[in-house]
Amino acid sequence: MTLSSSQSSPPSTQNLKRKQQTISSFFTKRAPSAEKRSNDIEDGRATTQKGAEMPLRETAGDQNNLEDDEDGDVVVRAPKRVKTNGVDPENGFGRNIKEASNIARRPDPPLSSSQRTNLYKFASSQADDAGIEKTDDPEARQRQLEREKLHKLFVKKLGGADCLIGIGRDATTEAPSGTEDVAEGDEDDESPPQPRSKGKGLSKKGGSKLTPLEKQVIEIKRKHMDTILVVEVGYKFRFFGEDARIAAKELSIVCIPGKMRFDEHPSEAHLDRFASASIPVHRLHVHVKRLVSAGYKVGVVRQLETAALKAAGDNRNAPFSRKLTNLYTKGTYVDDVEGLDGATPAASGGASPATGYMLCITETNAKGWGNDEKVHVGIVAVQPNTGDVIYDDFDDGFMRSEVETRLLHIAPCELVIVGELSKATEKLVQHLSGSKLNTFGDKVRVDRVAKKKTAVAESHSHVANFYAAKLKAANTADDAPASNLLQKVLNLPEQVTVCLSAMIQHLTEYGLEHIFELTKYFQHFSSRSHMLLNANTLVSLEIYQNQTDHSAKGSLFWTLDRTQTRFGQRLLRKWVGRPLLDKERLEERVNAVEELKSPERTVQAERLKIMLGKIKSDLEKNLIRIYYGKCTRPELLTVLQTLQTIAQEYVDVKTPQDSGFTSPILGEAIARVPSILGDVVKFLNKINMHAARNDDKYEFFRESEETEGISEHKCGIASVEHELEEHRSVAAGILKWPKVTYVTSSGIEYLIEVENSAAAIKRVPASWVKVSGTKKVSRFHTPEVIQLLRQRDQHKEALAAACDQAFAALLAEIASNYQSFRDCVQSLATLDCLLSLAAIASQPGYVKPEYTDQTCIHVEQGRHPMVEQLLLDSYVPNDIDLDSDKTRALLVTGPNMGGKSSYVRQIALIAIMAQIGSYVPARSAKLGMLDAVFTRMGAFDNMLAGESTFMVELSETADILKQATPRSLVILDELGRGTSTHDGVAIAQAVLDYMVRTIRSLTLFITHYQHLSNMAQSFPDHELRNVHMRFTESGSGKDEEITFLYEVGEGVAHRSYGLNVARLANLPAPLLEVARQKSSELEERIRRRRLARLLADVGGLIEDPAKGDENFFQRLISNAEQL
């Protein structure tokens, strides 16, 4: 509070506190007239009291302007501290400030003020010296001259009278030069403030000098222009420039405007600093996952030194050193065990995302670069989350069906393209990956790598050197298995080697190149031990996704998925997409399913379910994170405890025969589980479980397992803390107290509290540093305490580094057992998949299939597996009887919406389920080993390739004719409908004849061309049979109604009843009536033609009975049936 003149006697010096003066103390009112000044000076003390009531008139030496602080002590304002900013403090403005502070405290004469709100403007004109000369008081005159002189210099300093623009200019030019970010307050100044240069504060271009932090960011950004950088600055992570704009858009955070470009573009020369956005440190991975999921490449730039170690080092005055420590994309994000998936999509019925594979592709022999060339393709697909590697090398035709099949099977989230692709392949890749609505469920990131003419030789050398160095580092260069391993890699096809070399280089950038050391998990895609399901088959039969909204619900995988673990679900997905061809392996698998569902094994099966139910984490991903060295301490504890729990569950099992199951698959899988128990217990004995659960790095290891570095720094910390305790007696002696007790306030330790009495404060030495205080006490640090705390902080930082180093060594030791741990997890995944299939088999109406070496499909009362689960009503079952030696093909006719497509899909799905090793929805099933299922269903064009619907239809058919074998199942739906009736019938008849006579595949041919039914007569032994979907008719004319029975019957449906579908589609009634009349007229015309043809044949037979052979009579019967 401001004291009145009657209370203006100065207090004792001991109770006075100096308080900083604000900038407002330099403001003055407008200069008064000479007469008024003279009168005011004569008034003396009254004017002093009036001036004291106006805070903006307070001066540095005004004795009357006293205030009370929170302690109740009387304080006096201290003179303002002013930076020199390049001005000589002895000769310039700094000296005047010093002199002004030493002016005697005397009453000030009042100055005139405006009658409006701008009471405290600077005077626009200089002081009137004449008015000062008229005063009779020499002391007042001297004081006023000093004040006016100070006022002139201050106004000049501000840049002009009545102007505050200079203050703003100084703030914008000085702040960036001294600190990295004054606004954020995240970090102390990394370099001392730079004095302002004389003259203009900014360059001619505009904008200020770059801060050390901005220089670091620009230097890193120039090396990674395609990466969004997240930079650690103190206690936040920050984005700069264009990265800040993208982050603000994707993360919904605030972007502070500024420069967007990193190239000093003239259009941004007027801006002083970069645009920026920030996120808290503990939310880093949450936001990184969101950016990576959006398709961006994200880099994390971290500080490589801590504040304590930096303060003790030689570079204490330099900016913090920073480095790009992590790079992330969709496929390489392994820092979170949940990955980018979150909840299991298949289980929730949500969208089916990409599988996490990164696929590298390259081409050769792409001559012509048109749409019809043949190319040789090599691919390598890597799944960093699990360590799986798939490779393949193949030729492909102009439709690129082989490439499409592999892309749909693997479903990559990232593509690495080596060299240029042909136009057809490029268009296919863009079609499959260029939209969020594609078959992968999300947009796919695409990176491109240049391909030299000598790429094959260079790639071979690079791969050889890579594996040779790894084997040498592992000291296994002379081992026979290691040599065989190296030879296996070097024997890969040329184009696969090119892709492998590119992927090694690509993943090295992300620190994940170690995955290629796990060559045990290299798999060839085109292994002939599995049924081939090409791209069209995956889509048409809805193996992984439905065709409505591309989600997993309603797919075959969704139907069979009853797994309890993530790694079990991934293995089941592989089983679904790659059914077995090996009859022995298949029988072993289905026998295991049968044993799990049998009542005699209920107890053992429940024991397995309980064991799998205890697994709450994704062990497969956990293990690969341990292998990469990215596992956290609580995660490691969870993994080891989970492995210990499941290993102890079957600790009594020594051999497969001890498992309680007769199935070899079940016995071997269970016997492999307890084999890891010894290693797991050994690693757990090194860990302090309580500390690991709380992520306490300092106490993570048990005392007996701590390294020398950890023990040394812990002793150092204990020694410093002991010295701090000993220092209490020294502090007590200085204060003349019996004893001193340390206190902690706001997280600051080792504070000494002293009462705010005059006697107590006198005893506090000047070297003690006041840290905080209240009205009653003040808290101090002694110089010795400050020095000891600095030593303790250095020991703590070094201890943290030693703990991290020891933890990394433990992870490397565990990683040396990766193979055995991975085999155990793979056994658990197998058990999970078999239990899932057993749950399916336990449903009513499912039967164990019988396998035969003969190519056949004999199913009694079969049902569609997905439709049956989705529909509330019961599904109408149907039989199927196909045999390579008897009826190889069925010609399926029937009304629209009569169930033709569902029937043929049902047959294909039952065959696939049987070769997965699952029970099938039927009364009985006997199936041969099919090597492939091909489908040509649906109608769509390919505008990107300039292909019409009919062109796409025939191209896909041509691919089927090239790949199909006598052991394949082929489904052709309404071939030939994309052109005129005559051409369509001709093409359909030719294709059907070729399939039955030449390829001899099992064929299901759906058509609305009744004329094709005559072909059945031309094949002996009923190789081609006519079947139709049954229905009943009622009414006639416009009241005609049709009822679908969804049952398969022998013979041909001579009408398609398209008008019935038109009625269901709610076409206008007048339109339907016109269509019905036209249809009746056309049918009558065709019937008359057939009747005329029949009469002509009968007449010819009467004239020449010799024509009456078997084929002639069959034709007569067929024509009569069509009437």
UniProtKB/Swiss-Prot annotation:
Belongs to the DNA mismatch repair MutS family. MSH3 subfamily. GO terms for molecular function: ATP binding; ATP-dependent DNA damage sensor activity; double-stranded DNA binding; mismatched DNA binding. Its main location: nucleus. Residues 1-12 have a biased composition (Low complexity). Residues 197-207 have a biased composition (Basic residues). It comes from the Eukaryota. Gene3D superfamilies: 1.10.1420.10, DNA repair protein MutS, domain I, MutS, connector domain, P-loop containing nucleotide triphosphate hydrolases. GO terms for biological process: mismatch repair; mitotic recombination. ATP binds at G894, P895, N896, M897, G898, G899, K900, S901. The gene is msh3. Component of the post-replicative DNA mismatch repair system (MMR). Heterodimerizes with msh2 to form MutS beta, which binds to DNA mismatches thereby initiating DNA repair. Msh3 provides substrate-binding and substrate specificity to the complex. When bound, the MutS beta heterodimer bends the DNA helix and shields approximately 20 base pairs. Acts mainly to repair insertion-deletion loops (IDLs) from 2 to 13 nucleotides in size, but can also repair base-base and single insertion-deletion mismatches that occur during replication. The keyword DNA repair applies. This is DNA mismatch repair protein msh3. Pfam families: MutS_I, MutS_II, MutS_III, MutS_V. It comes from Aspergillus fumigatus (strain ATCC MYA-4609 / CBS 101355 / FGSC A1100 / Af293). Heterodimer consisting of msh2-msh3 (MutS beta). Forms a ternary complex with MutL alpha (mlh1-pms1). It is found in: Nucleus. Keywords: ATP-binding, DNA damage, DNA repair, DNA-binding, Nucleotide-binding, Nucleus. InterPro entries: DNA_mismatch_repair_MutS-lik_N (IPR007695), DNA_mismatch_repair_MutS/MSH (IPR017261), DNA_mismatch_repair_MutS_C (IPR000432), DNA_mismatch_repair_MutS_core (IPR007696), DNA_mismatch_repair_MutS_N (IPR016151), DNA_mismatch_repair_MutS_sf (IPR036187), DNA_mmatch_repair_MutS_con_dom (IPR007860), MutS (IPR045076). Residues 204-331 are annotated as: Mispair-binding domain. Residues 181-191 have a biased composition (Acidic residues). Signal peptide: none annotated. GO terms for cellular component: nucleus. Residues 32-45 have a biased composition (Basic and acidic residues). Residues 1-117, 169-208 are annotated as: Disordered. SUPFAM superfamilies: DNA repair protein MutS, domain I, DNA repair protein MutS, domain III, P-loop containing nucleoside triphosphate hydrolases.
